């Protein structure tokens, strides 16, 4: 028996190793097994059974004795016991190159086995029955490895059988035709023997087909019906993938509603990979137009689901859903309604490029691929007469209808792969813009011409840069040789075309700012060498003349900056046209500078009210100079002095037009930045550095003056520039080997920091209704609100950058942090990122800033409600909630934030006991309620740190305080409670139950610390702050240093203390133990000595006090917070969320024949009853039912 067992092991190992290594001799191995089967069925089948067991990762071996005398269920139970419970890996899930090929080889083995057996032993009613019975039993196992491997084997076995059934069907049809042909012959020519042979062959084929159908029914009913809704997504995906193959391979038998319903139901699966398999399976069906008639009912029932899947949370699923709809569209134009198509159209503007590209292909198939046969004769025509002319117009109409006029680049990129020829037909677009319309042709409207120019610019950019627009894609990639050649050809073609036509286009649309702005960007993508090689210098001269005319005509900032960038693109020293362009640019700036100085001199000499015409002339000239200074170094024109005079006069007189001040500030900013850039690149003399330093500081003073201007635009411009200048000239300026610029380092004084912070508080943290920039129309009003919010976010980000880079004091961030909850929707991401960055710089200082922000809010509440506020009030609850959110930002690693959390508690305790009650010691300190807020951070303390903080808290408490049980002392009791809880206990404060967020009873017991503090004599007189630490702890709590109270520009004290009270950092001691004010370390030593003397009495009294606290706390409900909208401060928890809501698949059977075909063969007697494992709820909703899917591994 042992020898036989060993022989089986060797044979089995050979099969498994062949499959694992993926050898090409798979057919010969199968043939050898077939020969072994013909010689000894049981031995060969035992080898095959052990092969499946080993492929499942099981170390057990089925012996001959087990095979002969045990039922399948008993064998599987025995094999389950042989599993290695310490590892959940098995061949189908193992990592490594050899296992990646295993699945393919495993599936190939099963397919080859059936193919080689299809004319012989497959019909012996033993081999296939045994294999199917085994796989059915294994697929019903609670062991995932058995279930996964056997389901894959069964599904591949079914696929192979479907192929056999298809061949049998074809042979039957051929035999039937031969029989009919022979029978229809004349009696004299008819061969009766042949008729008998054909009848016998048809009968054999029919019997074989019946046998194969029985096998398929057994697999389908025994495996598929139960496993397509398995708890494991991979198993469900296998089932759906294979049923798609069956329907495509043998559509006559499987492509009907009885099988399609499983795919339709599973499109609601909660896992994206399963939904993806549904879509790919359907794509294979819809691709074959001959099958469309069989899909009509399915399409009508599940079309809405497919359309909704274009918005799937998994982008891969959304892409395949769009591709499937494209195939549906090609099969029939009438299936998809206009609303269905519109749901796909808008996805061309998606930021996810694969989704957008798929939507672009759908759009192209729907709107652009239908060509009139009459156009075949004009295919070679170009320009306005080309067949693309109407398609270009259609594209323009679609772009305008979508009402997303700022996203033409996204539209072009979406269609770039499928409509390249159309989008690169620049001759057609150029002709539509320049040429007159033909007879009977309707001319483009002004709005359509603007859209066409914008699309034209985007196509030129896409062809020249060869990468998606900003916000779509991962960035630039290395181009292939073919792509580089295409890029060069495109740049050559567009340069040859637009170098000639661009001056004409600019002349035609010179008065239209929007059109001109887009057209002026075209030269940025030119191959400038063609101006010389193509002898196009005269067209360059025409272009420069048009640009000069546009500069003289327009004062719009966008137009002027486009002109400036065009000069910058053309002024490339690598090309021979540089001198010509540079001369034209210099002449233009000379005229502008002279005109500005002349106008400025006259303008500043006007003593009476400023003349509007003169002001307009000054403003228009200043706007032109500022636009050019943005892209060009105009230092040699000495623009600083003129702008300085203008700004200084505006400060002195106070009546300077706002736009003049705004552009003068911007122009002066450019002057300073260009000077700094030149010094950084080429170096500078000491005198030049001194001059720049003086100019920079004078300019900062001017900006600081304008922060208090009455005009909002001026204040915002001054603030933005100030933040930029302070950032640029901070200590960072010397980084990277620029030590020579150290004299330029400028740090803002406290007054400037206060003004910057005040600006943020007054202009950023405001309600939308307070912003006076809204318009009259509802749509314009909404757009203006969004624009105003975007502007305020930029202002806040500029100031937060100063905090992050330590340009301003970190404690100024307290006024920002305290707005976190109130303005979470508008600025939550900015404030949270600022917290994160400041914590990286200095954890302790960041923690002190957070507690300072809570103290400020607490003081503001006291000012508004006095000290008799209700701790269940919304204001106090909001502060507690903010504290909880702050605590969440510290993360889960308590060791990293240990020192910061300890310092936070120290500052909080000092603040709570800072103000003694004027009614005497029988009443709590005025800020005692702050301990309720501080308790939100207790869960972030380590166990030993809780004991240390508790000891520090006791220093501020009198003996009578520990005995107080009135409600006004609840914050102290709650805070002590949180410190005495276990190290891992996330105990919340007692009063949290009044905050309205729901409550739950905690069962954790509160234990007082049992360790006694004992200090060596040598340390009793030490001045180290660590004397207050518990020496029995294995880890030392961070030192709590005495620090001054942080203040801020708007922090208001509710009450001014007497000098002697404000000096004392702790609550007054008992009268009999009263001591003069001591330093921090002396107090620690004194307190420890007093505790050693009174230890016995205090322990007894504290036991009584703690027993009361425990009793009271057990009667209170600790809050278990409900997860809210903004719980993302914690580590994200990834969940599998069902795409469709429950009940969406109701009445799916209505109108469809969903009766599964009957099984002719009875279930195998070796198969375990399924009711023992789980109920057989054959309902589409059972896919979403966790009770049905809840199959554990063991």
UniProtKB/Swiss-Prot annotation:
Residue ranges with Low complexity bias: 988-1001
Residue span, SCD domain: 224-309
Entry PTM: Phosphorylated by PLK1. The large dissociation of cohesin from chromosome arms during prophase is partly due to its phosphorylation.
SUPFAM superfamilies named among the record's database cross-references: ARM repeat
Segments of this protein annotated with the region Disordered: 986-1027
Keyword Nucleus among record annotations: yes
Biased composition (Basic residues): 1002-1013
UniProt keywords, alphabetically: Cell cycle, Cell division, Centromere, Chromosome, Chromosome partition, Mitosis, Nucleus, Phosphoprotein
Pfam family, one: STAG
Cell compartment(s), UniProt: Nucleus; Chromosome; Chromosome, Centromere
GO annotation terms (biological process): cell division; chromosome segregation; sister chromatid cohesion
Molecular-function annotations in GO: chromatin binding
InterPro entries: ARM-type_fold, Cohesin_Scc3/SA, HEAT_SCC3-SA, SCD, STAG
GO CC terms, sorted: chromatin; chromosome, centromeric region; cohesin complex; nucleus
Family membership: Belongs to the SCC3 family.
Function of the protein: Component of cohesin complex, a complex required for the cohesion of sister chromatids after DNA replication. The cohesin complex apparently forms a large proteinaceous ring within which sister chromatids can be trapped. At anaphase, the complex is cleaved and dissociates from chromatin, allowing sister chromatids to segregate. The cohesin complex may also play a role in spindle pole assembly during mitosis.
Subunit structure: Part of the cohesin complex which is composed of a heterodimer between a SMC1 protein (SMC1A or SMC1B) and SMC3, which are attached via their hinge domain, and RAD21 which link them at their heads, and one STAG protein (STAG1, STAG2 or STAG3). In cohesin complexes, STAG2 is mutually exclusive with STAG1 and STAG3. Interacts directly with RAD21 in cohesin complex.
Identification of the protein by name: Cohesin subunit SA-2
Taxonomic source organism: Xenopus laevis (African clawed frog)
């Amino acid at each position: 028996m042992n020898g036989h067992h060993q022989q089986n092991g060797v044979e089995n190992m050979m099969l498994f190793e062949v499959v694992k290594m993926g050898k090409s001799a798979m057919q010969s191995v199968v043939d050898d097994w077939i020969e072994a089967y013909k010689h000894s069925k049981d031995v060969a089948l035992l080898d095959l059974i052990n092969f499946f067991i080993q492929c499942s990762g099981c170390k057990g071996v089925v012996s001959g004795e087990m095979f002969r005398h045990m039922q399948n269920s008993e064998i599987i139970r025995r094999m389950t016991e042989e599993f290695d419970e310490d590892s959940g890996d098995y061949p189908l899930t193992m990592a490594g190159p050899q296992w990646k090929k295993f699945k393919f080889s495993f599936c190939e083995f099963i397919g080859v086995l059936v193919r080689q057996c299809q004319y012989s032993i497959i019909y012996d009613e033993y081999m296939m029955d045994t294999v199917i019975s085994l796989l059915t039993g294994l697929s019903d196992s609670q062991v995932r490895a058995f279930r996964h491997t056997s389901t894959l084997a069964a599904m591949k076995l079914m696929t192979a059988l479907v192929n056999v059934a298809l061949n049998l069907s074809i042979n039957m049809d051929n035999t039937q035709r031969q029989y009919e042909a022979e029978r229809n012959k004349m009696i004299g020519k008819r061969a009766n023997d042949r008729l008998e042979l054909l009848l016998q062959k048809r009968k054999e084929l029919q019997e074989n087909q019946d046998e194969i159908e029985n096998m398929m029914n057994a697999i389908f009913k025994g495996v598929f019906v139960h496993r397509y809704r398995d708890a494991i997504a991979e198993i469900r995906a296998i089932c759906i993938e294979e049923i798609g193959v069956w329907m495509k391979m043998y559509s006559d038998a499987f492509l009907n509603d009885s099988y399609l319903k499983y795919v339709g139901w599973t499109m609601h699966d909660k896992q994206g990979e399963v939904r993806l398999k549904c879509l790919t399976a359907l794509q294979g069906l819809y691709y074959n137009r001959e099958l469309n008639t069989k899909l009509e009912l399915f399409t009508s029932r599940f079309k809405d689901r497919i359309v909704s899947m274009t918005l799937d949370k998994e982008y891969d699923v959304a892409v395949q859903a769009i591709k499937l709809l494209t195939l549906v569209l090609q099969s029939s134009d009438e299936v998809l309604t206009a609303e269905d198509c519109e749901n796909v159209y808008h996805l061309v503007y998606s930021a996810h490029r694969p989704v957008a590209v798929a939507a672009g292909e759908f759009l192209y198939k729907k709107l652009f691929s239908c060509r009139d046969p009459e156009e075949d004769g004009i295919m070679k025509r170009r320009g306005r007469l080309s067949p693309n002319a109407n398609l270009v117009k259609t594209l323009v109409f679609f772009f305008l209808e979508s009402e997303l006029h700022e996203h033409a680049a996204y539209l072009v990129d979406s269609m770039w792969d499928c409509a390249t020829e159309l989008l690169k037909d620049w001759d057609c677009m150029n002709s539509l813009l320049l040429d007159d319309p033909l007879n009977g042709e309707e001319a483009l409207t002004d709005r359509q011409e603007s859209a066409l120019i914008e699309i034209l610019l985007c196509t030129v950019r896409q062809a020249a840069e060869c990468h998606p627009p900003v916000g779509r894609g991962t960035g630039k990639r290395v181009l292939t040789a073919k792509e580089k050649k295409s890029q060069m050809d495109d740049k050559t073609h567009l340069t040859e075309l637009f170098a000639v036509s661009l001056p004409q286009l600019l002349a035609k649309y010179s008065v239209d700012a929007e059109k001109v702005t887009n057209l002026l960007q075209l030269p940025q993508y030119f191959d400038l060498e063609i101006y010389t090689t193509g002898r196009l210098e005269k067209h360059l001269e025409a272009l420069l003349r048009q640009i000069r005319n546009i500069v003289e005509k327009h004062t719009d900032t966008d137009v002027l900056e486009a002109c400036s960038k065009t000069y910058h693109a053309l002024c490339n020293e690598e090309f021979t046209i540089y001198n010509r362009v540079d001369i034209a640019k210099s002449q233009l700036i000379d005229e502008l500078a002279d005109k500005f100085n002349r106008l400025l001199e006259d303008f500043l000499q006007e003593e009476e009210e400023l003349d509007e015409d003169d002001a307009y002339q000054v403003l228009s000239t200043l706007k032109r100079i500022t636009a050019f200074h943005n892209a060009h170094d105009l230092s040699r024109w000495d623009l600083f002095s003129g702008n300085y005079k203008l700004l200084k006069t505006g400060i002195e007189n106070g009546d300077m037009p706002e736009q003049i001040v705004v552009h003068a500030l911007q122009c002066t900013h450019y002057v300073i930045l260009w000077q700094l850039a030149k010094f950084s690149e080429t170096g500078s003399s000491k005198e030049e550095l001194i001059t720049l330093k003086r100019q920079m500081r004078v300019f900062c003073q001017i900006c600081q003056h304008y922060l208090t201007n009455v005009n909002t635009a001026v204040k915002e411009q001054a603030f933005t520039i100030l933040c930029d200048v302070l950032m640029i000239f901070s200590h960072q300026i010397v980084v990277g080997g620029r030590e020579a610029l150290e004299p330029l380092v400028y740090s803002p004084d406290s007054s400037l920091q206060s003004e910057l912070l005040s600006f943020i508080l007054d202009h950023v943290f405001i309600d939308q209704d307070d912003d006076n920039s809204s318009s009259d129309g509802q749509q314009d009003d909404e757009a203006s609100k969004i624009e105003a919010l975007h502007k305020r976010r930029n202002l806040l980000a500029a100031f937060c950058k100063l905090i992050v880079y330590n340009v301003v004091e970190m404690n100024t961030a307290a006024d920002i942090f305290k707005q976190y909850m109130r303005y979470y929707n508008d600025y939550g991401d900015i404030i949270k990122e600022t917290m994160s960055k400041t914590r990286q710089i200095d954890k302790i200082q960041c923690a002190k800033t957070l507690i300072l922000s809570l103290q400020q809010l607490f003081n503001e509440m006291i000012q508004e409600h006095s000290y008799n506020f209700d701790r269940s009030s919304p204001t106090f609850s909001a502060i507690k909630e903010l504290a909880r959110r702050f605590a969440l930002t510290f993360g889960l690693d308590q060791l990293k934030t240990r020192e910061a959390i300890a310092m936070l508690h120290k500052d909080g305790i000092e603040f709570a006991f800072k103000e003694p009650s004027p009614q005497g010691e029988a009443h709590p300190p005025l800020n005692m309620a702050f301990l309720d807020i501080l308790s939100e951070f207790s869960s972030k303390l380590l166990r030993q740190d809780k004991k240390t903080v508790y000891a520090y808290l006791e220093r501020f408490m009198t003996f009578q305080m520990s005995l107080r049980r009135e409600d006004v002392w609840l914050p102290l009791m709650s805070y002590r409670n949180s410190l005495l809880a276990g190290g891992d206990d996330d105990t919340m404060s007692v009063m949290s139950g009044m905050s309205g967020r729901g409550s739950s009873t905690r069962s954790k017991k509160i234990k007082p610390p049992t360790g006694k503090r004992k200090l060596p004599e040598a340390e009793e007189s030490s001045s180290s702050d660590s004397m207050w630490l518990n020496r029995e702890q294995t880890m030392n709590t961070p030192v709590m240093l005495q620090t001054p109270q942080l203040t801020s520009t708007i922090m208001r004290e509710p009450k001014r203390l007497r000098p002697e009270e404000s000096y004392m950092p702790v609550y007054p001691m008992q009268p009999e133990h009263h001591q003069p004010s001591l330093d921090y370390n002396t107090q620690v030593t004194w307190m420890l000595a007093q505790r050693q003397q009174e230890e016995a009495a205090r322990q007894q009294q504290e036991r009584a006090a703690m027993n009361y606290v425990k009793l009271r706390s057990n009667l209170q409900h600790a809050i278990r917070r409900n997860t809210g909208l903004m719980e993302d401060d914690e580590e994200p928890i990834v969940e599998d969320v069902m795409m469709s809501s429950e009940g969406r698949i109701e009445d799916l059977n209505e109108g469809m024949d969903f009766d599964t075909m009957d099984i002719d063969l009875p279930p195998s007697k070796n198969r375990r009853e399924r009711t023992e494992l789980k109920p057989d709820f054959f309902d589409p909703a059972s896919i979403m039912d966790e009770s049905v899917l809840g199959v554990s591994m063991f």
